[in-house]
């Protein structure tokens, strides 16, 4: 199925690209989430009419993400959790806990933006946590987990 992308999608294309994708991917993911539209003649004409506005919105999202990344880079957050004698946590610290700690510090971060490639944190110590703010913008914070 041929679709027109309404935003940049990793490993697929940029705003305005006409791409061929499997029908299920288009029907179940791209179209319902507003990331693409079917490439019919009328949709192509409508997209070309809105292209400037969509590019401006994409640029605003990116600049907003870059300003957030500038605030977040080199930030250090401390989370206190109950831990045993050897530093093993009773429970774990996940993406929601990190996002809540950042929000409490006055920075707006969603849990879907926090990346923990090695899974949840189960030990006390210092960790570098990646934040995926936009398809082109990454930030990194220092997370300190202390036993309480």
Curated annotation (Swiss-Prot):
Keyword Transmembrane on this protein? no
Which Gene Ontology BP terms does the record give? translation
Q: Report keywords, A-Z.
A: Ribonucleoprotein, Ribosomal protein, RNA-binding, rRNA-binding
Coiled coil stretches, renumbered: none
One GO MF annotation is: structural constituent of ribosome
**Which InterPro entries is this protein grouped with?**
Ribosomal_bL9 (IPR000244), Ribosomal_bL9/RNase_H1_N (IPR009027), Ribosomal_bL9_bac/chp (IPR020594), Ribosomal_bL9_C (IPR020069), Ribosomal_bL9_C_sf (IPR036791), Ribosomal_bL9_N (IPR020070), Ribosomal_bL9_N_sf (IPR036935)
Q: Which Pfam families match?
A: Ribosomal_L9_C (PF03948), Ribosomal_L9_N (PF01281)
Q: Which GO terms describe its cellular component?
A: ribonucleoprotein complex; ribosome
Q: Report the sequence similarity comment from the record.
A: Belongs to the bacterial ribosomal protein bL9 family.
State the NCBIfam families in the record.
Answer: L9
Family annotation (PANTHER family): 50S RIBOSOMAL PROTEIN L9 (PTHR21368)
* Role noted for this protein: Binds to the 23S rRNA.
The name under which this protein is listed is: Large ribosomal subunit protein bL9
Q: What is the lineage of its organism?
A: Bacteria, Pseudomonadati, Pseudomonadota, Gammaproteobacteria, Pseudomonadales
């Amino acid at each position: 199925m041929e679709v027109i992308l309404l935003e940049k999608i990793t490993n697929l294309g940029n705003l305005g690209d006409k791409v061929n994708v499997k029908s299920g991917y288009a029907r179940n993911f791209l179209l319902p989430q507003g990331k693409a539209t079917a490439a019919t003649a009328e949709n192509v004409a409508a997209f070309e009419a809105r292209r400037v506005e969509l590019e401006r919105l994409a640029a605003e999202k990116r600049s907003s993400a870059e300003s957030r990344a500038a605030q977040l880079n080199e930030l250090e957050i401390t989370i206190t959790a109950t831990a045993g004698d050897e530093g093993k946590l009773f429970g774990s610290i996940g993406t929601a806990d990190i996002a809540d700690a950042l929000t409490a510090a006055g920075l707006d971060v969603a849990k879907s933006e926090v990346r923990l490639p090695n899974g949840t944190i189960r030990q006390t110590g210092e960790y570098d946590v990646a934040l995926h703010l936009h398809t082109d913008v990454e930030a990194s914070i220092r997370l300190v987990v202390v036993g309480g």
